[in-house]
Regions:
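A short, exposed loop/beta-hairpin motif centered on an aromatic-Gly-Thr core
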Residues: 15-26, 77-89
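Short, extreme N-terminal segment that most often corresponds to the first beta-strand
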Residues: 1-17
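Short, mixed-charge low-complexity intrinsically disordered segments
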Residues: 17, 36-73, 80, 99-119
Length: 119
């Protein structure tokens, strides 16, 4: 799953950014699905991040965490992971984060909507 920011320019309007969750197997697959979803509209992908979570939240709102995890890759780099957690308030969301991630260092924690799931 990828969290994709799409810059959309509709005729006569200022460009807007929308975030969509995209079920895809690769970045090429993400690009294909976004182009299909926004065919006929001036739309560009401005960012794309892999996102890890166990459930897909259909209501379009969740708590996003960017986490620097102490996982070493083959080239000895630390991994930055993005998680999505649905919670009714900030306190619960942070509690879920600590239970789920444990020792990871939280580098951002925000609540924001996404606009839909593109399959």
């Amino acid at each position: 799953m990828y969290l994709v920011t799409v810059r959309i320019k509709r005729e006569g309007d200022k460009p807007i950014n929308e975030q969509h969750l995209v079920e895809a197997v690769s970045l090429t697959d993400v690009d294909t699905k976004i182009r299909r979803e926004f065919s006929g509209v001036d739309a560009d992908i401005t960012s794309c991040k892999v996102i890890n979570f166990t459930e897909v939240f259909e209501n379009g709102e969740g708590w996003f965490y960017e986490i620097k995890n102490e996982i070493e890759t083959l080239d000895s780099k630390k991994v930055v992971e993005l998680y999505l957690q649905e919670a009714s308030d900030d306190r619960l969301a942070r509690e879920y984060f600590r239970n789920e991630v444990g020792d990871g260092e939280m580098i951002s924690f925000v609540k924001k909507p996404y606009y839909g799931i593109i399959r």
